[in-house]
């Protein structure tokens, strides 16, 4: 066919219009897309193998933003990398090996399969647990997960299908085929049960062939699995599976788990060899093995290439076929191999056109190929349909369909079906006559023929066909009856009529006619027409009818009349009698069946016989109510005897008569069914009989495979039209009730749907928010906005924009938010001052009296009464107040009826209720401040917060938001005196930071911390408010006036109390806390009075005296509390207690004071004017403790300038710089000691308390040291390094590790972390990665000081888990020497004498342990006569030239600072030697030849071994000893048997038997046979021999010479060869196998093989020139003599000559218009000249046409 044609006139205009329209459309699309430029070229692939990524870019040509992305990706380099290339992620990690991390080089290994961020480069330092993210993104093309093709692109994990395409979800099927349907493999599953015997300890479980996948075996029982393999090259292997692990067996990965009660074997596959799973018997019990795997179908159909074209030019066709291919051997095999698998469907042939070029201009023609263009293609041809198998109701008819081919002469021949498979095969079966068969249709019943008593009624029954017409063809057997009896309940009072009144016309006539009608069928039958009218109007007359012989023609559904002799069977009557009613009132009896009309005799019978009731039947139920039926009998009225029922008139039979019976209730039974037609269920115990079984087995056979759908999953959407899925599995229900899951191809029925739509209703309207805009400023503080549209998702899944009033109100903060960029630099002012700042107030508020409204500033804590309105302000600087946001317990707060969030930076809570308690957070950009609100109940107790308002997640959130230092301090306080032991308070860092001051406030409220009169007035507060007119104490009223509405204290004051309490001994905390709380209450109240100018004079105070400090300081109150009066006296009566130093908080020190007095725990700063320093130290204890002072760890040297006062205080006069340091007060008695330090600094310079000692720890779980020394400790302990600093102002402490600054809390490595708390550094669970130099730097305005501690981690000597290194060292030291590894339990090595041996001492530890060798407990150097060498840093001991005997025990002792480890091994020198045992048994019991031969044994350590081991050892000389030298008793002597008398068929052989006696001298003499007969039975002297049959080969005569021809006149002839006896009895051929077998075939001369190939002359060439000329000739096999054609197979012994060849292969010179084929006239007749390919071949003829 031509690929293009010339356009018709007018086409250019159409094309131009189309191009213009296309350009407009394209331009509008470009406008919508934002005018993108064309995509650029693809970049280089990110990888050269293993699957990488390449990208392409485009740019936006519009000034507006363009829709869509400017980058696209595709996969590339999807070829496997060579094995030596390594993992791509590992290459990226190793690139960081030469980059120091925290000052140290590591070898980095990849960390794969991170579920949180698989596309970040996380690596682990080799040999440690340190995991670090070295880069936020891996290189493009890196696999997201090790077992997935998904790849990381630009830091995001992109889905990649098995077709290596981005975004593709195509996956491999169970057979490993990408996007396969699972048809190339089959599921194999089964169970094996061991039946091993004593003689057979191994058995084969299953053979799993090459290429199988997803193998899983589970063994349950005592036996053991092992593997045997065989590769395709024939190499065999075995794996014993001795331990759990992952092995590589013949390049297949095997995952084996050995559990106590079972073994599990998994192999993902595909297997690279045949695996034979075997079982080894290890126990008495049987084992079972369940296995499942997918086995590849190794024989599959493979489509062939196209066969040669049917024509060489001018257009032909060609087809493909399919061949069966063996995947293992890579060769084509017979088709039956592929037919074995039902999953294999042979592909249908494909047809395509070929050689479409026109043939050369010549008169040649292509006729050598088997197909030709000028005759039709092979086609399907069908025979006519057969007759329908059924005339109605649906039948089938069939026909034959074959593939035929028509040659150029028009001859049609059948060919192979595959030649026609390019078109669908016509159906061979079709349904026919699918209309319904005729059916009986009954009309309604007529009225009863009588008005009283018993009568008859009739109905019309019609045969109706599928068209609704009355016709024949219905079965007479299924016809409903047309007559039945009827009873009128009205009694008859007139004489009984002899016969019931029959139906009047037309009922009787019509029913009788229809009843006698016959159906027309496909067989000729007599069909009667309707009866004529009766010949008389009364009395008896006659009726006649016409009888026709008819047949039903099925193809036309019409009826044809036939001659009467065509119908078989009796012809129905054509005349009968009729009765038209009585004449003149007579009532004669009439029998319609009596055609003669003779009625005599009936009257007599009627008079003699009649029906009567005779009793009732047995009751149908024994209880509970049943029924009885009356028995109707035919009786002789004269004799009253039973008569035959035929003698009574049937129409007179009385109606059925029933009555009830046995109405008494039944006893209790399981089911009761009686009068009420109900079922009453009773208790099972009330039934006497055994209860029948309610369950029985049925249908105990496997069900056919069927689809089993699971429950529908949840809808993918809650509204707007979603999808829900379910699993639909093909399963087979087994006979035992279990289910077997099968591949889907096993279920023939159509698969139920696994997807369906759901939630097809509209969604509620909701806001759709855009992305946040860019910040409104380029630096500093700005805002971001975003737009919102109200949309609704309809039930169709389409989103539509709706009116914004339909969406809920949108909070202001949802559309605008603050943003902070880098601070804007301004000349002369630090940029940090421009960040937002919240002016917080760090106060504690306690409400004591009811107030309507209270105002607070964020930053503090408030303990308030319910129903109080609270206004909370958030004063900010450098921040716009409308942008302030509020949170409560981490949740964003919005305005409501109860809480108002004002746009001016404050929050208002109306009338507090318990749910309002919590943590309120004000956010101004990055600045955040909190305010905690707690509620006070009516009993002055804090109201517990509702559980639902505080979850563990919120707790964790608040702790993270709180300063970790404060959290640690909170933890410390809660573990102190105020902790009540609850779980929440013992959780340490996770405790609620809002509970920090609850205990102090509770004490203030409950434990009388207020002045006494004040408390009394407080307690009557509520009653005073409830009843203002009640008579109360006027003093209390006055005190109530003095009580503040809300008491205020600074948080710092409460923090000092908590810190002070935490430093007190436990036994003093309760007492101390009472003092501190009481002092706090007095200070708060006094501060309030001072502020109000209401402080009464001392004489007017009704409160206890309070200590007033020298200056006014509301929240920094302090007081020197002395011991209580109880402690002042009565020392002997007090219980014994260890010393405790009272820790007190002094007033703030003034640097200008000339005399400084302070308590312990403070810092003293020496100024130029300081003349004296007095350090107080108060201690309690029983016995009274003694006090001594040290400075910087050394005892204080007292002098005239440094004095010890009588109260144990230390006074320093005229202090100088040498006096600077930490002074420690030590209190000691017999029960223990206590010490507290105080720092004295120079002009406030920082001071660090140091210790220069080295601490070694190998056992304790915790180590605490002061900074300045060295700590050597084992792993896993918690190390605390105290850095106690002093300075005024307070020095800031900074920690460094290896000169790198440490944060407040940080994970050093996996499992270890550090925490900073009040100047101390806590290292938890230290390991080698924690080693280093830790430095503490104290700095303030006056200077800085740095001290360091070196931390060294020790590892005690231990046996390493991996022994490959020392084994390699042993192999390198002595490749051929026997070696043994020492162990703590001891090992043993057995050696030959003179051998050398290597002993390895596997050890690891830090620092490297020192190894010492011993023999028998003595140092190896002092061992006598032992040649030894120590190599490998002491780990290898070589001992040489070991002599015989045990060498004793060798041991190696490894020791370092962390501990020691002793390992042992024993060397045993073995030797073989000969041993002479007792004499062996005498060789004879009598005669002169008996000797005792001494027995030699080869021994090894007293154990007998193979004598070969003693070869070369000197044998002991042994001499035989004579024994049993005496006369023997008489015995029979026999000679050898003679030769058999016959070689087959049974012969005889003989021997000589004599009785002889052997003397002690060795001479044997004959004696009488009787002497031997007394001792033993005489042996036989004759026996049969050669009993086997005599056989020979026999053969028949040669058959005719008619076998296959093998040459000219040469054929093959045969004869039979069989085995038989000499008697002619035929035997199996095996009986004659020992004899040479005669030949059964030979060559012979045959006239039939006198044949040869005969060829005709070549035809004319199809072309005179060119490359397409062919000629053919006839080739046939003919007989030489007759010259007639014979079958070609007779000539097959010779090569068949060619029947076609090319010709006239020369270039054509002229191109004139002429015909090149002789069929051009037919081309013109068929009007094919309009086709180009014919027009060119028949140029001349078509030109004339």
Swiss-Prot record:
<feature type="disulfide bond">
    <location>
        <begin position="790"/>
        <end position="807"/>
    </location>
</feature>
<feature type="signal peptide">
    <location>
        <begin position="1"/>
        <end position="28"/>
    </location>
</feature>
<feature type="domain" description="PLAC">
    <location>
        <begin position="1709"/>
        <end position="1745"/>
    </location>
</feature>
<feature type="domain" description="TSP type-1 9">
    <location>
        <begin position="1649"/>
        <end position="1709"/>
    </location>
</feature>
<dbReference type="InterPro" id="IPR013273">
    <property type="entry name" value="ADAMTS/ADAMTS-like"/>
</dbReference>
<keyword id="KW-0964">Secreted</keyword>
<dbReference type="InterPro" id="IPR013783">
    <property type="entry name" value="Ig-like_fold"/>
</dbReference>
<dbReference type="Pfam" id="PF00090">
    <property type="entry name" value="TSP_1"/>
</dbReference>
<keyword id="KW-0393">Immunoglobulin domain</keyword>
<feature type="disulfide bond">
    <location>
        <begin position="549"/>
        <end position="567"/>
    </location>
</feature>
<feature type="domain" description="TSP type-1 3">
    <location>
        <begin position="436"/>
        <end position="493"/>
    </location>
</feature>
<feature type="disulfide bond">
    <location>
        <begin position="45"/>
        <end position="76"/>
    </location>
</feature>
<feature type="region of interest" description="Disordered">
    <location>
        <begin position="1114"/>
        <end position="1137"/>
    </location>
</feature>
<dbReference type="GO" id="GO:0062023">
    <property type="term" value="C:collagen-containing extracellular matrix"/>
</dbReference>
<dbReference type="Pfam" id="PF19236">
    <property type="entry name" value="ADAMTS_CR_3"/>
</dbReference>
<feature type="domain" description="TSP type-1 7">
    <location>
        <begin position="763"/>
        <end position="825"/>
    </location>
</feature>
<dbReference type="InterPro" id="IPR045371">
    <property type="entry name" value="ADAMTS_CR_3"/>
</dbReference>
<dbReference type="InterPro" id="IPR050439">
    <property type="entry name" value="ADAMTS_ADAMTS-like"/>
</dbReference>
<feature type="disulfide bond">
    <location>
        <begin position="534"/>
        <end position="578"/>
    </location>
</feature>
<feature type="disulfide bond">
    <location>
        <begin position="779"/>
        <end position="824"/>
    </location>
</feature>
<dbReference type="Pfam" id="PF07679">
    <property type="entry name" value="I-set"/>
</dbReference>
<protein>
    <recommendedName>
        <fullName>ADAMTS-like protein 1</fullName>
    </recommendedName>
</protein>
<keyword id="KW-0325">Glycoprotein</keyword>
<keyword id="KW-0272">Extracellular matrix</keyword>
<dbReference type="InterPro" id="IPR010909">
    <property type="entry name" value="PLAC"/>
</dbReference>
<dbReference type="InterPro" id="IPR036383">
    <property type="entry name" value="TSP1_rpt_sf"/>
</dbReference>
<feature type="domain" description="Ig-like C2-type 3">
    <location>
        <begin position="1261"/>
        <end position="1352"/>
    </location>
</feature>
<dbReference type="GO" id="GO:0030198">
    <property type="term" value="P:extracellular matrix organization"/>
</dbReference>
<feature type="disulfide bond">
    <location>
        <begin position="874"/>
        <end position="922"/>
    </location>
</feature>
<dbReference type="InterPro" id="IPR000884">
    <property type="entry name" value="TSP1_rpt"/>
</dbReference>
<keyword id="KW-1015">Disulfide bond</keyword>
<feature type="domain" description="TSP type-1 5">
    <location>
        <begin position="607"/>
        <end position="667"/>
    </location>
</feature>
<dbReference type="Pfam" id="PF05986">
    <property type="entry name" value="ADAMTS_spacer1"/>
</dbReference>
<feature type="domain" description="TSP type-1 4">
    <location>
        <begin position="522"/>
        <end position="584"/>
    </location>
</feature>
<dbReference type="Pfam" id="PF13927">
    <property type="entry name" value="Ig_3"/>
</dbReference>
<feature type="disulfide bond">
    <location>
        <begin position="1177"/>
        <end position="1225"/>
    </location>
</feature>
<dbReference type="Pfam" id="PF19030">
    <property type="entry name" value="TSP1_ADAMTS"/>
</dbReference>
<feature type="region of interest" description="Disordered">
    <location>
        <begin position="966"/>
        <end position="991"/>
    </location>
</feature>
<dbReference type="InterPro" id="IPR056272">
    <property type="entry name" value="ADAMTSL1_dom"/>
</dbReference>
<feature type="domain" description="TSP type-1 8">
    <location>
        <begin position="1528"/>
        <end position="1591"/>
    </location>
</feature>
<feature type="glycosylation site" description="O-linked (Fuc...) serine">
    <location>
        <position position="310"/>
    </location>
</feature>
<feature type="domain" description="TSP type-1 1">
    <location>
        <begin position="33"/>
        <end position="82"/>
    </location>
</feature>
